[in-house]
Amino acid sequence: MTGHAEAAPGTLDIDDVSVLVDGRPLVDQVSLTVSAGEVVGLVGPNGAGKSTLLRTVYRALRPTSGRVLLDGTDVWRMPGKRLARHLAAVLQEHAGDFDLTVYEVVAMGRTPHKRPFAGDDADDRAIVTAALTELDVADLAGAPFDRLSGGEKQRVLIARALAQRAGTMVLDEPTNHLDLRHQLDALRLVRRLGVTAVVALHDLNLAASFCDRLSVMQAGRVVAHGAPRDVLTPALLADVYRVEADVTEHPRTGLPQVTLLTGHDLTGQRQGVAQT
């Protein structure tokens, strides 16, 4: 692989992964295969284990048992720099603020492709500039990262992952802090890149619109997996989320659309009005 080559989409295998903390399973025997170029959404209520599972993929947390394989190689056996050339992560939390400009943060995405102590070359600068433009933060290039709003920081971190040119992406609530336009832009970008992606999302309608398949997590386990129209059913939403909802086909897109019935409890007793 050349220094500036873009990694091809890889196959990601989560093989019987469990994570135990103080004897309690946060992730419980999860297996999931994401084919090259496929976008799989992780959905489920808070505390279901989505973020914990993703941390095992981008190697922030070692599984108690099981393996995570990228193109057949255990990610824990890959040199860090090699893994970073092939896998990029966008996290929902910002681990402290960087004492760097926006440009410098995005340029960090080029680090896996450089020799030690090497500076940016023309290709690096072009890639960083393109990523800044793609995420609509080019006008912030010289601004201190730590002075940005939450949404601006999120877009910068997505731009950093884009500059990494990895073939596989892990995104934990990438639309967190983003307004509606930038939520759509971010997920459209993931689709357009053609990368292999696992995306944790809370918005079920966004998940149905942009993901090839959904894995529904509950209490650390995957309880349903498949195409959005097969997975998102009123019965599943009642069981997993404890809400009553209608799931209909959107008349323009043909995709499943979830409408929460905020005026009903799970027994169907009228309490108020319905809301999309």
Roles of regions detected by a PLM:
Residues 43-45:
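The feature captures the beta-strand-to-loop junction immediately N-terminal to the Walker
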Residues 58:
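Helix-to-loop junction immediately C-terminal to a conserved catalytic motif
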Residues 66-74, 83:
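Conserved ABC transporter NBD signature motif
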Residues 234, 238-276:
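ABC ATPase nucleotide-binding domains
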